[in-house]
Amino acid sequence: CTKGNAMDKYEVLKKYWGYDDFRPLQAEIIDSVLDGNDTMGLLPTGGGKSITFQVPAMMLPGLTIVVTPLISLMKDQVDNLLERGIRAYCLHSGLTRAESRLVTDRCRLGKVKMLYVSPERLQSETFIENLRAWDVSLIVVDEAHCISQWGYDFRPSYLKIKTLRKLFPAVNVLALTASATPEVADDIMAQLEFRPGWQKYVKSFNRSNLSYIVRYDDFKERTLVRALKGVPGTAIVYVRSRRRCRELAEMLEKEGISASYYHAGLDPQDKAERQNAWKSDQVRVMVATNAFGMGIDKPDVRAVVHFDLPTSLEEYYQEAGRGGRDGLPSYAIVIASRSDKALLAKRLADAFPDKDYIKRVYEQAGNFLEVAVGSGYNQIYEFDFSLFCQRFKLQPVMAYSAMKLLTQAGYVEYVDEIESRSRVMIIAPKHEFYSLRLDEVTDSVFGELQRAYTGLFADFVHIDENHLARRAGATAEQVYQSLLTLSRMKVITYVPKKSTAYLFYTTSREEPRYLLMPKAVYEDRREAMAKRIDSMRRFVFDSTQCRVSTLLQYFGEKAADDCGTCDVCRARRAVAPTKEQAAQLRESVLYVVGRNPGCTIEHVVNTVRGNRADAIEAIRALADDDLIAVKGVTLHPLQTSES
């Protein structure tokens, strides 16, 4: 790789993102990539992973390929880049053939800077053939822990990334993840066949502005309300089930706390509206499953509450890390009950149903999709998972686990998060419009379509039928029928929105008796999950060790001191400062900040006399009273402090 652009990294950052400087380790990772090194970046949640490949992508001469498993996040990033004037596209199972062809043609012609692909795309022989003709400058592996069998989210399709290495042996690889133990990090580099001279950058897992608190209560709702009333500002509450999302949001509303809910089963437009209401502070609390939060960079989340326990410390750390990205003191709260230990054990049993059950689910899926034994190889099928479970009377959690295990064993690729908004492209030439014979409603819809959206002749454009209906004075159903009519007339290509799952056969359908569940997929992964659950259980139910020390130890990092702000450290301290002591501490903080404008929170905490937790509390109080301003991790006086 060469630095093939006259602009340096700071100019690129300023031009496209408007920032003057990089976050910690971003510049070092970018330099390593531009120097042609295979590079590993371990940047905890909120560390700005995407900038580390998007900036070099704009400086390198050819195409940057980004492999990522999260289709919703992929689409969000592409939309964001297009808004910045960067030519970015994505390829995934939810696109039509016409859309896929449009993207691959542009890549062939060198008109794309960044191409996001889902890992299963690397199993397509057609895609691999297309790749050979492209000028590729960089390969990026996002969520790189998915390539490791020891990781908490192993995806076999990630192993196909090695195909890219063989196709482009001279092109370097950037692997990125937010949470990986040392064992997983080493495995990632081994799986991606890092070459000599590789570089590894690990940002500390310590988030000094986050206070980790565990509360024990069998009546969790009571503690949740108390916590949210005690911590002002935006919050996320994580739960494990869709039903509980709705129930808790309704309960919080009754308690006078503004709340909404979010899960994967919601309509795409409904999701977008709820997400925007929360991001713009119209809604204070979002109750959500783990489908919420990826790629959402809201800096002022003051509390992340886990109402249900996650299965691993990797998941917990990633979700808790969505709090306090602005550097201000924030809380990561776990609410635990006595029954949670048993629930964690049940989760292990649900994740690994017995092998006969897995074979049965495989056979039933083939029957449901009408795929004959010996056929189906490399075919993709729409898969209504709810209907499948109803028809065969399957318990959804265990059936889903069976699908994941079949995916990990390499028989199928189950993709359950594809959502596509409606999109339209005009395919008829303009001069033919005058001879079209359209009814009044269709004519009005077609006219408003062209007025409301740009770029319709060049590409598929996302549209909103309800918005078109309001403009055309029609109903959404009339708009839908009008667009279908125009599509049948070959005036437009119309792809209506849908939310569906897919099942992709990576091998021909087998007889169940020949199905093998390898030890590495079943027994070894079951043991690894049992260890992760045990680490989660100890983190929550062991009240003798500082929570931060426990977390850092798990991720292979040594804590210099106990944090002083978690519930364990606070309990040791026991005695709260008097009003006079608290006032004196606030004065000390004001004095230090006044003399050192722009100093870090860490500097102030280490400089003033007193307990760490009390110092952070003093900073919080001064910021609330508008006496100091917090910008990132730095503090600035809003009034002159007198000596």
What are these regions (language model features)?
Residues I29, S137, A303-V305, Y494, ...:
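Residue-level detection of beta-strand scaffold positions
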Residues K3-Y16, D20-P24, E28-S50, A57-L60, ...:
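Helicase motor core with emphasis on the C-terminal RecA-like subdomain
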Residues D354-S508, Y514-A618, D625-K631, L635-L638:
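C-terminal accessory/connector segments of nucleic-acid motor ATPases
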